[in-house]
Amino acid sequence: MSTKSKIFLVLLVFCPLSFAAHWLGWGETTVFILAGLAIVPLAAFMGTATEEIAVVIGPNAGGLLNATFGNATELILAYIALKEGLIEVVKATLTGSIIGNLLLVMGFAVFLGGLRYKEQNFQPLAARLNASTMNLGVVAILLPTALQYTSTGVEETVLQNLSVAVAVVLIGVYLLSLVFSMGTHAYLYDVGVAENMEMPELGEDVSEPEPPTEEEKPNLWLWTGVLLVVTLGVAVESELLVGSLEVATESLGLTALFTGVIVLPIIGNAAEHATAVTVAMKDKMDLSMSVVMGSSLQIAFFVAPVLVIVGWAIGQPMDLNFNPFELVAVLVAVLIVNSISSDGTSNWLEGILLLATYAIVALAFFFHPTLV
C-alpha cells in the first residue's frame, strides 16, 4: 500500500468525529473543520473506486465513468449548497475550483516535478487544444456577466434563460470533447503514445496498440459497493459542511467569498491534487497536465452547466452572472497557464510563477470586502 493511501486511510477517522461533533454539539466551527477533513479521503477513495471499475468495464465505458465521476465531490458539495440557497457560494466554489486547479495544483506539480527533473515535457498539441477549450469556458461565464453590467434593467428571468441556453451549449461541447478525446483523436491523449505517432490522415484508421498481458481484474461488485458507500459518505459530510458553513466562516473571520473561492475547492480537490503532483514527480507530466486540465474543463463544461439546469428545476435559479472579481481571477489563471503550457515543456521556475500567482489571488480574495 502506498504512503498516499495510508494517509487517506488515517484521515477516515474524521468521518465518525464529524458525526460526533454534530450530534454532541461541539460547535459549528468544529463540525465545519472535521467535515472538511473527512471529505478529503472519501473523495480519494471515490476516485480509486472509479478507476478500478473502469479497468473492468473497458476503456470506452471506463473513460466515460471517469469523466462523469471526475468532479463528483465538487458536484455533490455544490448541489447541497445550491439546495440550501447559497447560490453565490456555489458560484464562488466553481470559479475557485478552476483557479485552484490551474494555479495551485499545476503550480505544485510543475515545481516539485521540476526539482527532480531539470526539464519535463508534455504533449503541446493536447495542451493547446485544452487551452482553446478553456477559453470558450471563460467566454461562457463572461458574457452573461457582461450583459448584466453593460445593460440597464435586465430582468433576472432574462439572465436565467440565457444561462440555461449557454449551459445546454456547454454540455453539448463537453459531450463532443469526450468523443474527440476518447474516440476520433484518442491517440493525442494516450500518455507516451502521441509523441511517438505521426498525425493520421482524415479517414485513416489508427492502429490499436498491442494488448497488454492479461492480469487479474478488480472485483466489480466490491468496487461498485465502495463507490456507492463513499458517494453517500461525501453527500452526508457535505450536508454537515454546508450546514455549518455560515456560522463557521463568521467565527473564523473569513468572508463567504474567500471560503467559496479558496477553502472549499481545496477540500473538494485535495485527492486530485495529490494525484497530479505524485505523477509529475514520476516524470509523467502528460498525465499530470491531463488531470489538472481535465478537472478544470469538467468544472466549466459539465459541473457548472448541470448546476444551472438543476437549480432551475428545483426552484433555486442559478445563473452564470458571476462576481466580476472572480472572472478577473479566472481570466488571469487561464492566461498564465496558456502562456506556460504552450511550448510543451516545464521547469521549476514556471511552477513558482503559478504558485505566486495563486498566492496573490488568494490574498486578494482574503482582503476583498464583498460578502456573498
Curated annotation (Swiss-Prot):
GO biological process: calcium ion transmembrane transport; intracellular calcium ion homeostasis
Gene Ontology molecular function terms on file: calcium:proton antiporter activity
GO annotation, cellular component aspect: plasma membrane
InterPro entries: CaH_exchang, CAX-like, NaCa_Exmemb, NCX_ion-bd_dom_sf
Subcellular location field: Cell inner membrane
Loss of function: phenotype: Disruption causes the rapid degradation of pigments and salt-sensitive phenotype at alkaline pH.
Primary site of residence: membrane
Membrane topology according to the record: Multi-pass membrane protein
Top-rank taxon, per record: Bacteria
Disulfide bonds: none
pH dependence: Optimum pH is 8.0.
Sequence intervals crossing the membrane: 7-27, 29-49, 62-82, 94-114, 134-154, 162-182, 222-242, 251-271, 294-314, 320-340, 352-372
Record keywords, A-Z: Antiport, Calcium, Calcium transport, Cell inner membrane, Cell membrane, Ion transport, Membrane, Transmembrane, Transmembrane helix, Transport
Any single Pfam family the record assigns to this protein: Na_Ca_ex
Cited function: Ca(+)/H(+) antiporter that extrudes calcium in exchange for external protons. Plays an important role in salt tolerance. Does not transport sodium or lithium.
Entry's family note: Belongs to the Ca(2+):cation antiporter (CaCA) (TC 2.A.19) family. Cation/proton exchanger (CAX) subfamily.
PANTHER family assigned to the protein according to its UniProt record, in alphabetical order: VACUOLAR CALCIUM ION TRANSPORTER
Protein name: Ca(2+)/H(+) antiporter
Naturally occurring in which organism (per UniProt): Synechocystis sp. (strain ATCC 27184 / PCC 6803 / Kazusa)
